[in-house]
Amino acid sequence: MYSKIALTIGGSDSGGGAGIQADLRTFMALKVHGCSVITCITAQNSIDVTCVEPVEKNTLLIQLDTLFADFGIDALKTGMLLNERIIIDTASKLNTYKITKIIDPVMVTRTGSKLLEDSAINAYKKLLLPIADLVTPNIYEANLLSGLEIRSKEDIENSARKIIGLGAKAVLIKGGGLKDMKGKDFFLDLNGRKEWLFNNFINTKNTHGSGCTLSAAICGYKALGFELLDSIQKAKLFVEKSLDNSYKIGSGPGPLGHH
């Protein structure tokens, strides 16, 4: 039943809504066995993040080595890579793995606040984009990666071209950060194939972990053997249904219901 294996590399969300926890729930919903490598531990709830602690270098590398020594992992995704050191160490390992790599560049919050220092963003560009089979930035992250201010559909397409120029094989820019772009994402690959992808917009405030869920679902579908664009389309539908089943557990935005 769970013959395929997907790996998530990212941060632990103590509130259970995003990060590793959302990724593993997504993998389980897709009937894919989920493995995890923790890069940082957070203390958070629905309204605040009160602490973020990176794991030690050896702890990170041993987690990766131990998993790959025994499991035939079919696809992996990255989430929160907290600093330049973690990005460098992760990229050095990922460069040796000949499997699908989905890079979710968690750099900016949904409201536009930067999570990473410039040195870490530069490490993303130099080390992770060239080995990415797909990068899944939101509008703000695409801005940082491409250096282009994004205000329109045309800006999104130009930003995608810049990101492809940095070495990524494909990019999916999530348009939800722009007015009138809810549920609209832009896909571009190295061969010039481009698609605007549309889904129904689910009007809910319970969206915590939606970006993590999307990249995890893409990773899960790739592990199951689907082509990349098919995986993206299926993942978008999965997120739509999960948002429709979202629920409230605290004072702030609640998590998705992964079904």
Where do the protein language model's features map onto the residues?
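Phosphate-handling active-site elements
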Residues: 30-35, 194-195, 221-235
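Short glycine-enriched, charge-decorated loop/helix-capping segments at active-site entrances
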Residues: 48-54, 113-118, 147-151, 203
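Short pre-catalytic strand/loop immediately N-terminal to key active-site residues, enriched for Gly-Thr
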Residues: 5, 9-15, 194-208
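Conserved phosphate/ATP/ADP-binding segment of small-molecule kinases
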Residues: 118-194
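Charged C-terminal helix
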Residues: 54, 70, 229-259
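Conserved N-terminal subdomain of the carbohydrate kinase-like
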Residues: 2-8, 20-110
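Short, small-residue alpha-helix embedded
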Residues: 21, 26, 143-144, 204-228
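Glycine- and other small-residue-rich loops at beta-strand/loop junctions that grip anionic moieties
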Residues: 12, 78-79, 113, 207
